Amino acid sequence: MRPLKLEVKGFTVYKKPQVIDFTPLKFFVIQGKTGAGKTSIIDAITYALYGKVPRYGASVATKYVLSRGEKELKVALDFSLRGRNYRVERYYREFPEDSQVRVYEEGRRLNIKANEVEKWLFKISGLDYKTFTKVILLPQGEFDRFLKESSERKKILINLLGLEELEKVRQLASETFKNLEGKREALKKEYELLKDYTPTKKEVLEKTLKNLEEELKELKETEEKLRQELKKAEEKDSLERELSQVVTKLKELENLEKEVEKLREKLEFSRKVAPYVPIAKRIEEIDKKLTELKVRKNKLTKELAVLKDELSFAQEELNRIEAEKEKFKEEKEREKELEHRLKKLQEIKEILKELSQLSSSLKEKEREYEQAKQEFEDLSERVEKGKKLVAETEEKLEKIKELFSEEEYTSLKMKERLLVELQRKLKELKEKEGQLENLTQKYKEKKKVHEKVLNELKELERELKERELHYHAHMVASYLSPGDTCPVCGGIYRGKALENVDAEGISELKHAKELKEKEEREIDTTLKLYAQKINSLKEEMEKLRNEVEELRKEIPENLKERIKKLEELRIEKEKLEHKLNKYRKALEDRQKQKEEAQAKLHKAQTELELLKEKIREKSRLVKEFKELYRVERLEDYEESLKEEINYINSKLQEIEEKEKKLRKHFEELSSRKSKLEGELSALNESINSLEEERKEKLKELANIYEVAKSPREVVELYLGDKEAELERKIKEFEESFQSLKLKKSEIEEKLKEYEGIRELSDIKGEYESVKTQLEEKHKKLGEVKRELEHLGERLKRKEELQKEISELEKKLEVYRVISNDFRGDRFQKYVSEIMLQKVVDRASEYFYKFTGNYFFELERATKGRDKDIVVVESSTSQRRPVSSLSGGETFLASLSFAFAVSDLLSGSANLESLFIDEGFGSLDQDMRERVSEILEAIKTNVNKMIGIVSHIPDFAERFTERIVVEKKGDYSEVRVIY
């Protein structure tokens, strides 16, 4: 695994977006002052991959790494692994809280949930969170002590490799030993139940199976022969049935031969008359047209005769009307005088209408006058009553004011507010009692959940211990070779095989344990919060009770009755005041109405006198008209005038209308007569032309007189488009007849090939019998196979049980050794000695690459003294202590051991990157001179990306590749130099 690019925003000191490109870097330094955020770069890499940061704990809440004052966080890491590129992005928002994870492979997003990322990383890299955090950042200072302090060497190695948990392994081994013993006994009991399933029984069944298969083979051969014979018989039967059908059809066609002959004759006639059909059709068209024209001619001749009579009558009528019109012109002079009288009469009628309206208006004015007079008298009386009512109301109001005190009412209302406050506090007290009961119930329920979670956590810890025990047992065995002496128990290791260890399962269990621990902490926090809330509620309730007592002391006993009495008086007072204002206003309104009524009465009297004078003048004009024309009733006189005028006008109009209609009718008749005469002339010409054409066509038809005697018969004999259909039917008949005769001969010839074939029914019966036998044999064969398969499974299970029991006994031997012999710290010492040798050997390879002359060896242990590390010069084989190394050599030696531990921890994880926390202080003169040479040696001999975290400027400046972290107030920025 090699980082390619890191993007951060809102992460610890990196508030603003920062991008670190690792691709041009190989051996570099992360440079910056203390607190600038150097280690935060490695924290960001770890957080991007696993969502956790080691220094804040494995199950850290993201809010601890969120930059101060920021609401959102983003960390993204691009890395390569085994030739493929990956990207992991993590997003977090504080409110509303939300977190997301996205994973990409070669630019394509993978469907991986947040809780599946660590499992996916372990699958592709072989590194779980715990291992990754040990190998990503190595404490250089520890390796410096590792070299120089032999007494602390094993302790440091145990800490680096995580061997401090091996005592837990021993305890788990003891528990697992008991569990495995129980499992072995159960397997032995199951093995005992399978004792009757033997190989001999299997051989008997296999022999039976073989016999059945041979019998089946013979039956199948017989079946195949019968099937072939049955096929021949079915073919013969099919041919015989087909021959019968062909013979039947031939007879049917022979019966149709006479009808087909008639069709041939009909077709021949049609072909003979075909050239004359257009002539015959034209003759028929001429006959039809002549008939129509002659009918039309007769009709028009009759119409022309009638039309001539009508014209003569119309001329006579016109002459009579002209004479009558001349005579009636004298009456028009008298009409003018009549119209003058009628106009005068209309004027008199209008005057009479006006008189009628004036009479109605007079009555209305008289009524209005009486109403105005009555209204004035009523209002005068009501004004007097209003004055009396105002005086009575004022007297009542004065009496109420004497009983009601505004100051007392205000004081009591203030006390009433205290009563409302008392009721509010009593209600609040009741609500808090309900809240207390609810919280107490929730606390009890959450307590039960807490106990359940604690039990689940204990079960997870037990299972995790058992898995780790198995894992470490496997690790112990991996360091021993067959024939080695166990340094703990002294026994000989015989190379007993162990099953593969599911490291991924351990990682998942640890993750589940961490989640359960987090859940337990959250529940515990909730319980404490509930307890705080309960105590707080109790304090608030006590305070409320005291306040209630104080309020009760301040409120008088009969407060409500006293307020009620005063409230009634106040309401009565307000009502009387409202009435008084109302009465006063009403009195003012009535006085105004009285004045208006008096003015209205005077106006009505004046209008009444004027109206009477106008009526007298109009009546005089009507009387003068009647005397002039001696008229008794105006309606009768008007009617006689109108009748006389209407008679004169209508008579003259009638004469003119008749004249107009007759002239129009005469013109129409004349026009129609001309048209009829022209049409008759054209009809005569058409009839003559058609008769000539008919004679010519009949002469042409004389050539086929022996076939058809008339044009109609020619048309009927001609088939037209039906000729082709008739010809096709005749041809189909002839072809079918010949085809059936040929087919009959072919079938008769084929049937000769099937002579000697048995009857179909006999063969079918024999075939069905053989098939039944085959089915029975197949059924029997299946039963034997199933029995044999079951026996095979049982025998296989016996073998599996033998193998499982054997493997369990091997495991039991290992756990027995661990639980009984690896006591105290002997196991840790033993493993640490093995690992020390491996670390020294691996570091020696690196040191020789860096120096070209030196390597490490472990001295032999002496009584009371641990093995020590010495430096050996390859050219002279001279040995010297590591304390004799110069500053630059010590730096290279520490790096060698750092790389060695990283290799051992990462195993097959292909870790292509490493970060080292340098632990030297300021460089001495020798180191300053040699640092460039050292860095070049590391670049040349290590195929890894290596970063050293340093806060010492003179050390960092020696690197050509640098990541510089600079503090900018409350945030930091990063620059990459290469």
Curated annotation (Swiss-Prot):
Keywords assigned: ATP-binding, Coiled coil, DNA damage, DNA repair, Hydrolase, Metal-binding, Nucleotide-binding, Zinc
One GO biological process term: double-strand break repair
Cofactor(s) for this UniProt protein: Zn(2+)
Gene Ontology molecular function: ATP binding; ATP hydrolysis activity; DNA exonuclease activity; metal ion binding
Coiled-coil annotated residue ranges, if any: 160-421, 440-478, 510-542, 578-826
Family: Belongs to the SMC family. RAD50 subfamily.
Subunit note: Homodimer. Forms a complex with Mre11.
UniProt name for this protein: Probable DNA double-strand break repair Rad50 ATPase
Species of the source: Aquifex aeolicus (strain VF5)
Gene name as annotated: rad50
